[in-house]
Amino acid sequence: MKRKKKLDLERYTPALLTFIANKLSAGASQLYREQFDVGIVEWRVLSMLAVESNIPAQRICQVVGLDKSAVSKSVQFLQSGGYVQSQVDPEDARRYTLSLTTAGHALHDRVFDVAQERERRLLETLSPEEIESLLSMLNRIHKQIDHVNAYRP
């Protein structure tokens, strides 16, 4: 029996986005481990805490889209290295919030420079207008995720 349905992997947007993200993450993780002894998940935690300080781990999961166990494992690793500290949430004593230490900020800044160069290399074939257009489209797609994930045939 001949199959009639098959994805065009160069035109199926979810696959293309996944392939790009997977390859970028794998390359970044390898480089960051070699250079800084942190992987991509630790970098995502560091970068989130540089953007929003004193937040619960749940907030990192929500924004970055990582599962709780991956964030928890990375936070423990970063705490043991002295990069992240936890404190009781002043608004809810049952919760803890996370923030970067001085060493965490320094590590973030070193990785940030490398991440920025990787982004520059990724986008170097695009004009500034194309980059703005790409970012606009990606942000619009990102806002559709809940709508897409709510679909049940």
Question: How should each PLM-predicted stretch be described?
Answer:
Residues 1-36, 83:
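N-terminal leader segment of winged-helix/HTH proteins
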Residues 12-15, 44, 121, 132:
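Active-site phosphate/pyrophosphate-handling residues
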